[in-house]
């Protein structure tokens, strides 16, 4: 852990953000990665096993005195949430009891853009918009959460456009 702490301390002078993508778990790689952290962002999906793992990681972060812990919920499928087949963002947030800074819908665009080597944010998709909003929240901006209902989202956008016209 001392080496990563030293490395991150040296990098702080040159960078506003230093992101370390670390493995979830209790092994040494995780412990080394969080040693220099002053903030943690836990990314999970709305499946029971993933939430259980996220809860364990949050406990480890708290045990290591990392006080600023946020949550991103990835691969939300509004149609499944609506049918009761998937936990909602609120359900996951209630279970894990840490602030949610983003929810990313599960979209075909993600797979397509990754396979084509295209940046998702340029695609104009809901997932791309969610990623941009997460970045804005990380930088301290207050950004409302988007409606994950793809059909209602389109209607809201159209009505918003018509109101401006």
Positions of PLM-derived features:
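Secondary-structure junction/capping motif
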Residues: 87-88, 119-120, 153
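Secondary-structure transition/capping residues
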Residues: 15, 103, 121, 142-149
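C-terminal boundary of histidine-terminating zinc-finger modules
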Residues: 114-130
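P-loop NTP-binding site
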Residues: 99, 129, 133-165
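A general boundary/transition motif marking the beginning of the first structured unit of a protein
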Residues: 80, 122-126, 146
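Conserved catalytic-core segment of NTP-binding enzymes
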Residues: 2-112
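Generic serine detector
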Residues: 49, 88, 113, 125, ...
């Amino acid at each position: 852990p001392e080496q990563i702490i030293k490395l991150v301390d040296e990098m702080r002078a040159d960078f506003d953000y230093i992101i370390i993508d670390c493995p979830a778990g209790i092994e040494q790689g995780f412990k080394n990665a969080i040693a220099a952290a002053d903030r943690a962002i836990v990314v999970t999906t709305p499946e029971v096993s993933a939430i259980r793992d996220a809860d364990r990681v949050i406990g480890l972060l708290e045990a290591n005195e990392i006080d600023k812990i946020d949550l991103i919920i990835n691969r939300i499928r509004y149609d499944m949430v609506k049918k009761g087949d998937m936990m909602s963002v609120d359900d996951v947030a209630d279970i894990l009891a840490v602030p949610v800074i983003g929810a990313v819908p599960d979209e075909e665009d993600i797979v397509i853009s990754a396979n084509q080597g295209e940046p998702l944010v340029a695609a104009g998709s809901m997932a791309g918009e969610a990623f941009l909003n997460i970045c804005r929240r990380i930088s301290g901006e207050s950004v409302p959460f988007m409606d994950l209902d793809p059909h209602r989202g389109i209607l809201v956008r159209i009505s918003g456009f018509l109101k401006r016209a």
